[in-house]
A protein has these predicted regions:
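Acidic/His metal-coordination segments adjacent to aromatic residues that form catalytic metal sites
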Residues: 39-44, 98-101, 165-188, 233-245
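Active-site cradle of extracellular carbohydrate-active enzymes
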Residues: 112-119, 133-208, 228
Length: 441
């Protein structure tokens, strides 16, 4: 075992490890062993040659530590952080910020966003790691003060790829000038507004706002999130990467990273309208991808999430595009409880089919091709309904089961009846893409 996922670059495997860790935490999955095996087969320099590469793994190990508190994961993360801090922060070009690689002084957005987020993710562990209480927080504040003044955030509240400077050894793009940095030598290069640049910053700002009690930082995050879901989309409000349909393997991961961090942002918000807007966006994208963008030949997902592209088996699909889709599904599952109407008499029990403590199922009325709204409304009208579960499957496939104590003769018209032994619902079988809702008595 190499510690890397098949057909992925090194940094991508670090990103996918965070995706897997989120999946494990969601379902208490036995795949937890993969985290340990990955750790044993990698080191702090796994992933690539640049400082952004290392930090994807840093974040993955911190997420792994939150699921399984193995101190070796935490120590690996802080070792990466210390290496990046010593070698990447550079005041001589653009007045600060971390550069892309040891031999490339380009100041790009993602490397600096990752540095902000890494420090905020490490901040709660400062004492455990033998650092001063504000050590990581101070670095995060220093990074954000530089980032905000750098000109990376353009007039549309979107973040471009990086900065241009005549003093830089090299850079990835020099596409124009917009927004001058505070030292007067660097400007926004007007590079592509990749979706992941709009995503990682959201969690960094949310954590920084929470630590400093500065709500202005949340306002920044909301402006970036709003601009993304308004501008980087197809006409059907489905997220769009600027490179589509001709994205390379790096770029195929970007949308998954955005929605993951949009989901991370939501718990820190207090504005109900924004919460509902973001939850709705995630849910709509997830339903579209799950029902129309999976290739039935190999189970892989297309890089294009909009169903305006009719070929789900196009040549763009691979491990990277599928990893992004799983980020979307996990984000949808984590935000699902907040999407239920506050007036509802139902509470989300978890992912999977509804069952009792013995693993038995209740009798149910069931029907195929039923939306969740119809499923819930029909269950509401059944006085004997105890719970319902709704499943999304292959293209066009949605399935509703109303777990009920009602007489089979009193079922809704057009629905089938299945008899089973259980008489209550207490848990789920944790099946992905299915959600169980329990009636609130």
């Amino acid at each position: 075992m190499s510690g890397l996922w098949k057909n992925e670059q090194g940094w991508q495997s670090g990103n996918t490890l965070e995706t897997l860790t989120n999946f494990v935490s969601l379902l208490d999955s036995p795949l937890k062993y993969v985290i340990h095996e990955t750790f044993m087969n990698t080191d702090m320099f796994t992933g690539g040659d640049c400082f952004d590469d290392y930090q994807w793994w840093l974040l993955a190990w911190l997420q792994a530590y939150s699921v399984e508190p193995n101190l070796r994961y935490l120590y690996r993360a802080v070792d990466i952080h210390d290496f990046v801090t010593v070698n990447a922060w550079n005041d001589s070009i653009c007045g600060g910020g971390v550069q892309l690689c040891r031999n490339n002084t380009y100041k790009n957005a993602i490397t600096n966003e990752l540095f902000l987020l890494s420090n905020m993710r490490l901040h709660p562990y400062a004492s455990l790691l033998g650092r001063a209480p504000t050590y990581f927080l101070d670095w995060a504040l220093k990074e954000w003060q530089w980032f905000e003044a750098s000109g990376l955030i353009n007039g549309d509240s979107l973040i471009n790829d990086g900065l241009s400077s005549s003093n830089q050894a090299s850079s990835k793009s020099h596409e124009g000038n917009m927004g001058r940095s505070r030292d007067g030598t660097c400007v926004n290069n007007n590079g592509t507004t990749w979706t992941y640049n709009q995503g990682v910053i959201l969690t960094g700002l949310a954590l920084l706002a929470n630590a400093t009690r500065n709500v202005t930082l949340l306002n920044f995050a909301q402006k970036i999130a709003d601009a993304t879901i308004q501008r980087l989309i197809y006409s059907d409000r489905i997220l769009k990467e600027p490179c589509e349909p001709n994205c390379n393997d790096d770029q195929k991961l970007f949308k998954g990273i955005f929605v993951r961090h949009l989901a991370y942002l939501i718990p820190y918000l207090t504005d109900a309208a924004h919460i509902q807007q973001y939850v709705s966006f995630i849910q709509q994208n997830a339903e579209t991808v799950l029902t129309s963008r999976r290739c039935e030949i190999d189970g892989l997902y297309s890089v294009i999430w909009s169903n305006q592209s009719f070929n789900s088996c196009d040549s763009s699909r691979n491990t990277s595009s599928t990893s992004a889709a799983w980020d979307l599904f996990i984000a949808a599952a984590k935000t699902k409880p907040q999407s239920i109407m506050s007036s509802s008499n139902w509470t989300w029990l978890g992912l999977g089919n509804c069952m009792d403590d013995n693993g038995a199922y209740m009798p149910n009325f069931n029907k195929i091709n039923v939306t969740e709204t119809v499923c819930r409304t029909t269950a509401e009208q059944d006085q004997g309904a105890v719970a319902y579960d709704h499943q999304l499957g292959c293209p066009g496939y949605q399935y509703c089961r109303i777990r009920t104590l009602s007489d089979p003769q009193h079922g809704p018209p057009g629905w089938s009846y299945e008899n089973n032994t259980a008489r209550n619902v207490t848990r789920t079988n944790k099946l992905p893409v299915t959600s169980c809702y329990l009636r609130v008595v």
